[in-house]
Amino acid sequence: MSVSGKKEFDVKQILRLRWRWFSHPFQGSTNTGSCLQQEGYEHRGTPVQGRLKSHSRDRNGLKKSNSPVHHNILAPVPGPAPAHQRAVQNLQQHNLIVHFQANEDTPKSVPEKNLFKEACEKRAQDLEMMADDNIEDSTARLDTQHSEDMNATRSEEQFHVINHAEQTLRKMENYLKEKQLCDVLLIAGHLRIPAHRLVLSAVSDYFAAMFTNDVLEAKQEEVRMEGVDPNALNSLVQYAYTGVLQLKEDTIESLLAAACLLQLTQVIDVCSNFLIKQLHPSNCLGIRSFGDAQGCTELLNVAHKYTMEHFIEVIKNQEFLLLPANEISKLLCSDDINVPDEETIFHALMQWVGHDVQNRQGELGMLLSYIRLPLLPPQLLADLETSSMFTGDLECQKLLMEAMKYHLLPERRSMMQSPRTKPRKSTVGALYAVGGMDAMKGTTTIEKYDLRTNSWLHIGTMNGRRLQFGVAVIDNKLYVVGGRDGLKTLNTVECFNPVGKIWTVMPPMSTHRHGLGVATLEGPMYAVGGHDGWSYLNTVERWDPEGRQWNYVASMSTPRSTVGVVALNNKLYAIGGRDGSSCLKSMEYFDPHTNKWSLCAPMSKRRGGVGVATYNGFLYVVGGHDAPASNHCSRLSDCVERYDPKGDSWSTVAPLSVPRDAVAVCPLGDKLYVVGGYDGHTYLNTVESYDAQRNEWKEEVPVNIGRAGACVVVVKLP
């Protein structure tokens, strides 16, 4: 803090006068007055040389400085003398004042020199020791800096105790133990818990709102806590002082409930994590309900996810049978239940109703609406129609009739779509993307997409590189057929078991083929068209699973490579492709019962490298290219056409978001999924799904490796 110039002058003048009168050792004389006169005139108006020095002490001891005199209020007084010299001065001053007071006119003789000198030296030593102690103590804690500026001097200090907060809380804890300075008494049940409002408010938003607002409790010395476990409250009060909690299975729920009331976020998190670690099929429903009641979103979500994942084990426990109807409905309406089929969920509902038929019979109609009855086997629906539990309930009869129509009128299913016709995610299987061309000239990896986790995972690798091959699924196993490795066209076949992740070599085809189409129809697998390295093929081979051999069937009317092949309504369709001169827009189908191929209505555009799939009785053709064989500058297509076999007609639906050649298409659940492809510059890893009801495409989670010409199939594992 600086002072005005006037004050600086006054201070200097006072110091100068003091030094002029009292700075030298006392000169012994029998005449005190002459002593005063000598001291008074000897230095008046003359500078005092070498007497005003600034002293500072560092951590290692006393250090002299030649810096100018400081005038800050917190700084040392300008030009102080050493401690022993100040002692002598003070004694001299005191002695002189005494003489003045005793007799101003006739000075008395002064005490003997030796006695006076000894007293001065002793006093100086004492003061110097005290000064050294004070300086040592100060320099251990303070760092004082002196500026070089004569006009503006500033002293700054910073002091920090690392464990100050911890020491303070320990002191507060001791006050709590001794019941000292407590200013509030919390009453819960049989317990009376003393505490400090400041500590409680610092830890709990609940108490902060209570004690800092104009409410009745803010002025009360005793606060009654309703609806909270006394022991849990006491534990949380102790936690406010110590930060320590004991978590036990038998008290964790009461502790979490109290923490939710007091809005102790950290305690809520640790208690929730403790319960999450205890999740089991026998208790997950109880923890789920508790998390919902307490508003613990994280605990509720984790417990619900665990219940969905382990549903088959959960329904075997008592907690499931004791659930109220509204909780059962929350479970049944979820798409994420991990079950192999809808029939499993139906039997779980009937088990719950059977546990207390008299009281739960009336809830059956409401709960049955959450079961996807159209997806149940028709034999089961026929049995339910005559069951006494269903015949007397009009709502149940209505739902059963809807499901039976879905089975009896398959051609009308597209008009019967509802939430009950949408399969649950776990019942539709998983999507497998196999091989394809990538930036490294061909990938051998297999990726799996799970609807419930919404993610792609690497689950296997082919034994060798294949491009332009085909894949079909028989008995939940993937058959990889033909293709080419570089310029070598293959006729080899391999079988991949997703459960054991084992590859098995199968009998080869009779003809080497790449660019072929592969599909299953009524059991057997067909290899259609392609290129053998020399010419475009119209021949077709059929794999007999029982005989384990390949046989030729009727040939197509037109050679086709990069052809799309799919089965629909007991017929095998071959769509588009290339015949050596140009891309094709024609389509023909094979009837296995007559062993003949027949032409259908053509597409609106010539296309090869298309992706084909069926959904809800329609055939979809996606993407591709339309360049002739001699032109390498293909025009890539984003066009999507839909074929109606009943009317033998084509219609155009919403296009892809980007053009895709050599694209893979496959139905999964209630949507069509388009995977990868080539856009003219990049091997794509993007994925789109098509919603037929809304006629729109939606971007989905991408595959890990961009690929074109991959084969995508669905496998339903038990």
Curated annotation (Swiss-Prot):
Kelch repeats: 430-476, 477-523, 525-570, 571-617, 619-670, 671-717
Gene Ontology cellular-component annotations: centriolar satellite; ciliary basal body; cilium; Cul3-RING ubiquitin ligase complex; cytoplasm; microtubule cytoskeleton
Protein's name in the database: Kelch-like protein 4
PROSITE patterns the record matches: BTB (PS50097)
Pfam families: BACK (PF07707), Beta-prop_ATRN-LZTR1 (PF24981), BTB (PF00651)
InterPro entries given in the database record: BACK, Beta-prop_ATRN-MKLN-like, BTB/POZ_dom, Kelch-typ_b-propeller, Kelch_1, SKP1/BTB/POZ_sf
Localization, UniProt: Cytoplasm, Cytoskeleton
Tissue: Expressed in adult fibroblasts and in a range of fetal tissues including tongue, palate, and mandible.
Molecular function terms, GO-annotated: actin binding; ubiquitin-like ligase-substrate adaptor activity
Alphabetized SUPFAM superfamilies for the sequence: Kelch motif, POZ domain
TM segment ranges: none
Domain (BTB) ranges: 182-249
Keyword terms, alphabetized: Actin-binding, Cytoplasm, Cytoskeleton, Kelch repeat, Repeat
GO biological process, one term: proteasome-mediated ubiquitin-dependent protein catabolic process
Main location group: cytoplasm
Chain segments carrying region Disordered: 46-69
